[in-house]
């Protein structure tokens, strides 16, 4: 039984490493020699995946689920990153290691592949293709951060909420032709926290969008019409 368990664990790890190899566009054979340094872990909704700088020695590949990364600067400001499966994180300090105060939490049940940050940095130095791919991903990460900040600059609360919903659809939404689907985790409280407005105001705006058939609550998921984004999407 022990041998079967180890075999199953190794097969799972190999499968996820192949997924990572596809994501960063390299042959699996480049990662295979380092399989023993990697791990696969499962997290339940609400569980902390890491809190840096104490746990910043790993890079993670999100295999399944949704996460929120809350980055705290020296002034106490909070920057939120939302991610769904098929993303590598955190990579902003990959080439310039520094302490980053970032809390990463599972918004839904999640599965992640972990590997040492030093290993990824070494692979980048040894392989130009990996470096170029990671550099492009870092730029995408910065663009996401910029879009989030642009949404927060909207003068009117309703515009701010709409742009934040648009931002979430683009980052963690699932394209379903006429609408986007956002899984489980989105709540009125989270929207009010993101927009910096009261829960009551956020709830009133969402209610208006529901009346206009632009947002529909389907069980715990949100269905967002693409008509919502006309002329306001950042």
Curated annotation (Swiss-Prot):
Annotated DNA-binding residue span(s): 188-207
Predominant location: cytoplasm
Induction (record text): Induced by arginine and anaerobic growth during the stationary phase. Repressed under aerobic conditions independently of the growth phase and by glucose catabolic repression.
Domain of life of the organism encoding this protein: Bacteria
Listed Pfam families: cNMP_binding (PF00027), HTH_Crp_2 (PF13545)
Residues that hold a nucleoside 3',5'-cyclic phosphate according to the record: 40-129
BP GO terms, sorted: regulation of DNA-templated transcription
Matches recorded under InterPro entries: cNMP-bd_dom (IPR000595), cNMP-bd_dom_sf (IPR018490), HTH_CRP (IPR012318), RmlC-like_jellyroll (IPR014710), WH-like_DNA-bd_sf (IPR036388), WH_DNA-bd_sf (IPR036390)
GO (cellular component) term, any one: cytosol
Signal peptide positions on this chain: none
Keywords carried by this UniProt record: Activator, cAMP, cAMP-binding, Cytoplasm, DNA-binding, Nucleotide-binding, Transcription, Transcription regulation
UniProt GO molecular function: cAMP binding; DNA binding; DNA-binding transcription factor activity
Domain (HTH crp-type): residue spans on this chain: 155-228
Localization of this protein: Cytoplasm
Function text: Positively regulates the expression of the arcABDCR operon under anaerobic conditions, by binding to the consensus motif 5'-TGTGAN(6)TCACA-3', thus playing an essential role in arginine catabolism. May also control the expression of genes encoding proteins which are involved in anaerobic metabolism. Can bind cyclic AMP.
Protein name: HTH-type transcriptional regulator ArcR
Organism from which the protein derives: Staphylococcus aureus (strain NCTC 8325 / PS 47)
